[in-house]
Amino acid sequence: MAAWRPPRVEELLAEARRAFMEEFGAEPELAVSAPGRVNLIGEHTDYNQGLVLPMALELVTVMVGSPRTDGLVSLLTTSKDADEPQRLQFPLPSAQWSLEPGIPQWANYVKGVIQHYPASPLVGFSAVVVSSVPLGGGLSSSASLEVATYTFIQQLCPDSGAIAARAQVCQRAEHSFAGVPCGIMDQLIALLGQKGYALLIDCRSLETSLVPLSDPKLAVLITNSNVRHSLGSSEYPVRRRQCEEVAQALGKESLREVRMEELEAGRELMSKEGFRRARHVVSEIRRTAQAAAAMSRGDYKAFGRLMVESHYSLRDDYEVSCPELDQLVEAALSVPGVYGSRMTGGGFGGCTVTLLEASVAPLVIDHIQEQYSGTATFYLSQAADGAQVLSL
């Protein structure tokens, strides 16, 4: 089986323009895109003020549209996986009236960004959303839509905020309109991604540094398990709370401030489960710093070893893996030429990410498909650019 080739931005843009013309009877005036992402290492560390190392993908959300004069927002998505209805209309928020989350869920990400957008006056608009980022696959379709929405509104009502402030608006939208207490990684990489680079993000200071990832002999393979265990949505807030409780027990603001020796010394202050959760986070922050350094010096073997350690820690200490993800990782690791593999994203399903020699990619894909009990989807990606304004 070959890796899936996602549609290029130009193809998505053409689809969006056609849909806009059909729905609204005119050509759109504006177009933007924002990418999904894969996190190479640094899982469940962002909401602990830790380090993460994502890269933007060539999978993107495209938004096209035009301003309106009646104070309404009219939306349509072409995504088959989005919940119904695929179109809706609502008035802009005002001093007297705030937007509220509702049905369909996909539109809540758009509503949240509109509600929290920092500049004024807001202008109504009609827009069509088209995306190649799979929903629920752990590749951040939500942040992709939030950042596309923010970038679109910027064209109608320019803001003066720094990029970190824009990411925080999108993060707040997800907290308050989707009910997900996410960290800030997904929004930052969607804004700041650069072709040929991963991005090391310090989620405490919001400082970022580019890590070269453009060796043509190297490939990043994303494997979607195509399973989504319902545990994911309920367990995410539990993990976050457990981390906060351990930090509090140790008198720290977050687990970022905790060294492994301090955690070991304070074992009696927390539950066995809390200790394991914190051990994952503290060790994962250290692994992420080491991995960024390894990638910068071209030491792919060291990077791969750290990926594998990360997976085992997520499986055993953080307990967010599942049999399907474990199967995919073990299958990948059994092929020569694979440097490392791990689950990526929140867990309980979704995707794995594998670093490998580009030449063995077809072999790895065939082997995983043979070994995997389910039906996986494969996607080979280069590190891509962040949000863009597209010309029409």
Curated annotation (Swiss-Prot):
GO terms for molecular function: ATP binding; galactokinase activity; galactose binding. InterPro entries: Galactokinase (IPR000705), Galactokinase_CS (IPR019741), GalKase_N (IPR019539), GHMP_kinase_C_dom (IPR013750), GHMP_kinase_C_sf (IPR036554), GHMP_kinase_N_dom (IPR006204), GHMP_knse_ATP-bd_CS (IPR006203), Mevalonate/galactokinase (IPR006206). PROSITE patterns: GALACTOKINASE, GHMP_KINASES_ATP. GO terms for cellular component: cytoplasm. The keyword Transcription regulation does not apply. It is an enzyme of class 2 (transferase). It comes from the Eukaryota. The modification Phosphoserine is found at residue 230. Keywords: ATP-binding, Carbohydrate metabolism, Galactose metabolism, Kinase, Nucleotide-binding, Phosphoprotein, Transferase. Alpha-D-galactose binds at residues 37, 43-44, 46, 186, 236. It holds the Pfam family GHMP_kinases_N. The record marks 37 as: Transition state stabilizer. Homodimer. NCBIfam families: gal_kin (TIGR00131). Catalyzes the transfer of a phosphate from ATP to alpha-D-galactose and participates in the first committed step in the catabolism of galactose. This is Galactokinase. The lineage of its organism: Eukaryota, Metazoa, Chordata, Craniata, Vertebrata.
